[in-house]
């Protein structure tokens, strides 16, 4: 049986018994930007490809750690992979949902006009983090794996929509993240 990424996020959060975590917004220290471009029908969503000098690694339980176990293998397609959702408490200071919708729509537009899949380089490389920003909303995908990953723009779009609507002030949060069950990657949504 096939589930959408949004269904998997709900299932993961529910099965983990997680409504919110004590985890704060995960910050990237000493970030070095390798490239910047704009996406979407109106080219109004800023995209940066970068690397964090101090990488914020997060476990599937939402805990920041200094290292993860190395996995072997080549580039892996992680489209549709389960992830665990964590919201940042307390409420206040989160992104505007409509700004996050612009990013989600830009991802869908590029999925239809550029391609459904994108690649992100291995952890420790100059482009292991992809960040998208529109007005008050920022989302990023961080590869925590030692191999390149392939992910779906439609899945990222669904997660942006989910996190912006579920991890908001009405739910006593100000953004959140979804960490892959195998800890290879996470996607975060936060205020710019």
Model regions: which residues?
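Fungal secretory targeting signals
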Residues: 1-29
